[in-house]
């Protein structure tokens, strides 16, 4: 049922999509592209100095880290309380830097959710590898939107001679991490940044849909910061529910996704994912050798294949932890729904996620794209 290989495809209103107790209305064929709007300049700019020890250190020469394992420049944790300030909304904690720009919370519940998705992605890849794209073992790796830092930390542990940097809007990364790994937050990767053009061996981005306004600008910036011949890897979930029968008809799951798609489009940070737009934007940015893989993510273990069932168990847990987190800010900010209405819809969706009579699945997209050699 699930095939590996390329697939191509990508309303604003203050009123949520019409429904009749979750009656499903077929979505429009319109597949709007991502916003091309620019962001304001970022006031935190450079982390260009640090290099992998084995590549640049020589006997008796200067080490790229100081005695306590910190880089020669300080990570981007600001002492300005306004930058690190968090705020409460709907009983959840959100980041304070560029308040309201990102619709997901950053509290412990959300951090657990992000770590579950990280595990899901490694399981879904079969080989359970952290990176698909070619890369040196002593390279410079950059993780955009690193969240809890789990990917960066695991890569740093696996490749002790590499340097791994993670950037994120929220400073939620652990203070204790490998000495060859650093985090820089708050950091808005959509704003202009200078982190050493032509200096990174791999740039990684995971689950950016819903947080990015201008994909073409972001891809051009990523392209500029990679070394010639280096790779960019992106992992995204298309949350639009699919099934190969009619078990999704009239479900809360379908209604929930339609509402979420519309609300995030209204905020100009659409959660809807288009592989066609992604590949075109990567090509327009200058990338070549673009590889696109898709993996089916069953919503619960209804599938007969054992690997699919293993993936489904992790994805069921991930989705169960995600529905309310994904819904709170978009539905309250855009539709002005009361908390009780959001929680009721989330509960209905979670109930369906455990129903093996509903044969729903989502699609995981994995992209690798190379910056050409000069």
From Swiss-Prot:
It comes from Emericella nidulans (strain FGSC A4 / ATCC 38163 / CBS 112.46 / NRRL 194 / M139). This is Protein-methionine methyltransferase laeA. It catalyses: L-methionyl-[protein] + S-adenosyl-L-methionine = S-methyl-L-methionyl-[protein] + S-adenosyl-L-homocysteine. The keyword Transcription applies. The modification S-methylmethionine is found at residue 207. Gene3D superfamilies: Vaccinia Virus protein VP39 (3.40.50.150). Methyltransferase that performs automethylation at Met-207. No other methyl-accepting substrate has been identified yet. Component of the velvet transcription factor complex that acts as a global regulator for secondary metabolite gene expression. Controls the expression of the sterigmatocystin, penicillin, and lovastatin gene clusters. Controls light-dependent formation of the velB-vosA complex, veA protein modification, and is required for light-mediated inhibition of sexual development. Within the velvet complex, controls light-dependent secondary metabolism. Residues 23-40 have a biased composition (Polar residues). It is an enzyme of class 2 (transferase). GO terms for cellular component: nucleus. Its main location: nucleus. It is found in: Nucleus. One of its GO terms (biological process) is regulation of secondary metabolite biosynthetic process. One of its GO terms (molecular function) is methyltransferase activity. InterPro entries: SAM-dependent_MTases_sf (IPR029063). Disulfide bonds: none annotated. Component of the heterotrimeric velvet complex composed of laeA, veA and velB; VeA acting as a bridging protein between laeA and velB. Residues 1-75 are annotated as: Disordered. Its EC number is 2.1.1.-.
């Amino acid at each position: 049922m699930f095939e590996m290989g390329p697939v191509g495809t990508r309303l604003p209103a203050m009123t949520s999509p019409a429904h009749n107790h979750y009656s499903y209305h077929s979505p429009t064929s319109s597949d709007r592209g991502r916003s091309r709007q620019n962001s304001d300049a970022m006031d935190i700019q450079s982390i260009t100095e640090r290099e992998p020890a084995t590549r640049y250190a020589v006997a008796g020469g200067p080490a790229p880290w100081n005695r306590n394992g910190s880089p020669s420049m300080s990570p981007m944790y600001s002492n300005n309380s306004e930058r690190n300030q968090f705020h409460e909304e709907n009983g959840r904690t959100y980041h304070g830097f560029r308040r309201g720009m990102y619709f997901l919370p950053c509290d412990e519940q959300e951090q657990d959710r992000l770590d579950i998705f990280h595990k899901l992605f490694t399981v879904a890849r079969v080989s359970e590898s952290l990176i698909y794209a070619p890369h040196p073992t002593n390279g410079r790796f950059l993780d955009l939107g690193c969240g809890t830092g789990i990917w960066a930390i695991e890569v740093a542990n696996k490749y002790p001679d590499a340097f791994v940097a993670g950037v994120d809007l929220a400073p939620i990364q652990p203070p204790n991490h490998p000495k060859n790994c650093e985090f820089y937050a708050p950091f808005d990767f959509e704003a202009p940044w200078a982190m050493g053009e032509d200096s990174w061996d791999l740039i990684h981005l995971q689950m950016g849909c819903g947080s990015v306004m201008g994909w073409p600008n972001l891809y051009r910036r990523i392209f500029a910061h990679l070394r010639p011949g280096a790779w960019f890897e992106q992992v995204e979930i298309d949350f639009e529910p699919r099934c190969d029968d009619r078990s999704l008809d009239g479900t809360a799951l379908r209604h929930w996704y339609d509402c979420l798609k519309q609300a995030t489009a209204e905020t100009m940070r659409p959660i809807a994912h288009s592989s066609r737009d992604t590949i075109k934007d990567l090509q327009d940015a200058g990338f070549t050798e673009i590889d696109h893989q898709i993996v089916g993510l069953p919503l619960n273990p209804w599938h007969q294949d054992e690997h699919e069932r293993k993936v489904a168990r992790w994805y069921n847990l991930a989705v169960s932890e995600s529905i309310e987190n994904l819904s709170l800010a978009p539905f309250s900010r855009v539709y002005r729904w009361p908390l009780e209405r959001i929680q009721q819809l989330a509960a209905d969706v979670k109930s369906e996620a455990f129903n093996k009579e509903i044969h729903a699945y989502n699609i995981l997209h994995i992209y690798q794209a190379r910056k050409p050699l000069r």
